[in-house]
Amino acid sequence: PKVGIRISIEGLQETNDKIRGIPDGFNRGYNTLKTLVEMGHPDVGFGMTVQDMNCEDLVPLYHIANDMGMEFATATLHNSFYFRKTDNRIDNKLKVAKNFEKLINELLQSNSPKKWFRAYFNHGLINYIYGNKRLLPCDMSKNAFFIDPFCDVIPCNGMAQKAVMGNLRNQTWDELWHSDQAKQVRECTKKCERNCWMIGSASPAMHKYIWVPGWWVIRHKFLKGGKYSLSENAYMKKDLEQQ
């Protein structure tokens, strides 16, 4: 089956084990991924949620994943009903952004088109950290969705309150997807102003509005020689001047 496996590893060993609070968690996660690679699984990798505590491990962890031929997925702190958090925040935005900048340049220097588009996704994470409107429209509940462990189908896991379109235990897919309840939830998502930037909602948008990330990739990979700078972002001017 086409199943991708990601294990959350929040940095190098000391950082990861401190954040996760799991004894020897880094080695356990790393060895699990290594075993899957040795077994020939085609789609395994790290998933890292970047924050103040671990941002300096971002590029080193990418290098570990890259050297092993694994995928490297990134995210940053979000608040939502699903995460049961309302106080997640990044204090030193510039420090975190600078480490994303380093990662973006690493990705742009690769020979992988997939990584070039991941560079754009990480550019979007910087934009999100600074509290801006998301780079692309969100169409969750229309062209993508999330299924929670209780079989509730919801638009995504980033909303302030849970909005259920239906439940797969009680309804067929067609009944659920075309129900009045689903239509009401779509109206809610249309008005959502959270501007979250997670791969679950960003990836479908990047495919639908491909010309936007496509032009960004052409500009940075080919016209700028694979280089990206935080100074391109007008909203960062004040922070960059004060550093």
Spell out what each predicted region is.
Residues L135, N157-Q243:
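Flexible mid-to-C-terminal extensions adjoining Fe-S/redox cofactors in radical SAM and related proteins
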Residues V3-E10, E14-I154, G158-N167, Y209, ...:
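Radical SAM enzyme [4Fe-4S]-AdoMet core and its adjacent flexible, acidic
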